[in-house]
């Protein structure tokens, strides 16, 4: 399935577009998707620790703009937004 990760705030530095696309073979919870994003950033940005911290501290939202928790399961093609903390916290 294709997950389009919409980038907001500081996460926009992850790409020259306003999104990243991930292709995942099976259902995935946000906590595991978060790890996939970090793995991608480790490769793309040679272990940029600040980017990892952004992902770890970020909230995620569903296509219908609801904040979702780490146990939320992505089970189909969908858009997910990553919302980094604002103002340092």
What residue spans do the PLM features occupy?
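Ubiquitin-like/PB1-type beta-grasp interaction modules and other compact soluble beta-rich domains
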Residues: 1-88
